[in-house]
Structure formats: structure tokens, C-alpha cells
Amino acid sequence: MSRVVWIVIDSVGIGALPDSEKFGDKGVNTLGNIVKAHSDIKIPNMRKLGIGNIDGVDFMQPIENPIGVYGKCAEVSQGKDTTTGHWEMTGVLVETPFKTFENGFPKDIIDEFERRTGRKVVGNKPSSGTTILDEYGEHQMKTGDVIVYTSADSVFQIAAHEDIIPLEELYSMCEIAREIMMGDNAVARVIARPYVGPKAGEFVRTSNRRDYSLNPFEPTVLDNIKESGLDVIAVGKIEDIFNGQGITEAIHTKDNMHGVDETINYIKKENNGLIFTNLVDFDSKYGHRRNIEGYKEALEEFDTRIPQIIEALNEDDILIINADHGNDPTYKGTDHTREYIPLLVYGKNIKQGVNLGIRKSFADIGATVADILNVKLPKHGESFKNNIEK
């Protein structure tokens, strides 16, 4: 039977959605603006799959005979973050935005967190991760206080130096925060942000990040696959995004290339169902930090691995590559951007060069995955399996 290898290239948006101005994101285009800033970008394998042939892509020449199926998806859910994007992909729409705390967290929340963890809080405001470490990192090392901060996303983030607060204690504090941030105060994610380094300006966040999500509101495609007795193998932060729900096996990764390595390892193993990978570096290392050149280089690095991924596929396997939101490194601020996501599909036994056009929802991807694996379809989404079958 077919397996699906589903790779999320985190934040690689492909142009502003019609409602992007409502989200403060006029004229954004993550991939397009990177290409405009670096016209020498080399992503030949994504181009072979058809990324330059997608409707509305005017920043890259289309090619004559793409080997993949290609299109783009609009987002129905009211958000532009990781949780919202991944949940919609798997058939759960977020129609009421997750709560955000643009002025920091209320005193009663911080008081309860301090009481239950036994640690004082500093920060408690919206900030980028690098800025907050420059501001409070040395204080945190001297005092043992913890840095709590948020962003335009629905997140409660806790930063601590790995030499001062052990990872297990940091993770335990995140579990406490997750319990507190429920009900009327529910945030989409509590995030552990460990860092290392000697002083401000030299602090580096480590790959020991962990996300503590809410459970999806409804069953996802992952639940349907698991309940059918198939594998749902989560690579990278997929397990965290779904709070483990619908997952049969998981491995966390330290960077994009480790994520690709583990994906290829699983493709080569005996398993049935879904291998679901998130490659987060595009977003966390380059999008939020508005590092255009780093983002370009990360795209090129991933592109060089696509032939290895394709070579590892079995005859009936289907590869899907898409993003979950945008994070335009040329845009103001440090937050995600509301964009269409590219959709690339490849398989040795599916059609080539099919234009899927503009899909109405990210959920069409999950519906197609369910359809390919012959499991129950999700509540939302329209499968395009019939468009790609030979």
C-alpha cells in the first residue's frame, strides 16, 4: 500500500492572502521576497517539482515539464501560527483566534506561576527571543530567576540558561505553565526556550526547545490514521504541535538536516501509514530573526536533499512538501506573516505536471493524505487524490 511522507517546510509562505492586511501583513511574500533579494538562489529540485509553476508566482521562471504536482493553499483559520497551520492541515479549523497577551501576562497568572515553581519571573512582555536574552540573560544567570515572555502569537515562553536551571526543571515549569494557561487564559503553546553562552550578545538558544500544546479540538487526520492501525511517525516538533495526539512514534530533531536524516531513515524502514516531518529552522533561525541570507541558504541546503528523499521512496510512496504559514524575513517586526502556502506532491506512480490551482484550505492536504491511506476523511478539506492518480 501507499505510504505518505509529509514534510512541512516551516514558514515558507508564497504570497499574501487576500485578508493579510487584517493581520498587519500587507504585501508579504516569504519566498518571493527572498528570491528578489537573492536572485542567485539555487533551488533546482523544488523548481523541478513545480514551485515556479504555481499560480501567482511571478518571481521565478516556470519550467517546461515539472515532475511534481503543484499548487497553493489558502488558510481558512483565524491565525498565522504553527499550531493553527498544522491543525488546519490535518482537518481542524481554528475559527476563534487563540488568546494573545500583547501587554504581558496578568499579575495573578505570574503570581501563581512563581508560587508553584518557586522561581521569580523577569520579563513578562512581548519580545523576540534574541532581544529578551540580551536584556535579561545575564540577570537570569546571576539570580536563577526565569525569563517569561510572549509574542504576537499565542505563546507563553520560558527561557533559562542550561547551566543554571536543568532542562528537566525547565520542562517541569512548562508543564505547570500549561496547567495554568487553560480555560479563559488558554494559549496555543507553552514553549521551553533553553539557552547557553557566557554573556549578552553571545547567548544562543539550543535545540532542547520543547512545545506544550493544547489538544486539537476535534479528531485530526492523524487520529484517523492511527485508529486504522497504521503508523503515524512524527519527526521534529510534530509531536509537540499535536500534544502527542494521534502519534504512534516520535523523534525530536536538533536542526533541519537532522530532520531530513531521520525522515530518510524512517522511509528506509518497514512501516505503513504516515511519516510527518517539520523542518523548523526556516522559521525559528531565519524568519523571526529577519535573516534573509540565512533563510536563502537554508532553502538551498534543503533543496540539495530532495533527490535523496525521492531516491529513498518506495514505488507507491507519495511525498508532500508544504509550509504552515509565512515568516517574511524582509518584512517589519519579527512575527509570522499571513500567506498562501506552496504545495508540492511527488510519487513514482502519480501524474506529473498537474496544476492543483489555489486550494480553498490547508485542510485539503490532510483530506488527501487520508484518502491516499484509505482511512476516514476529516471533517474539513477536499481531497485532490483523484486529480493526481494515474
Question: Which stretches of residues belong to each language-model region?
Answer:
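Feature captures the catalytic ectodomains and active-site-proximal regions of enzymes
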Residues: M1-K390
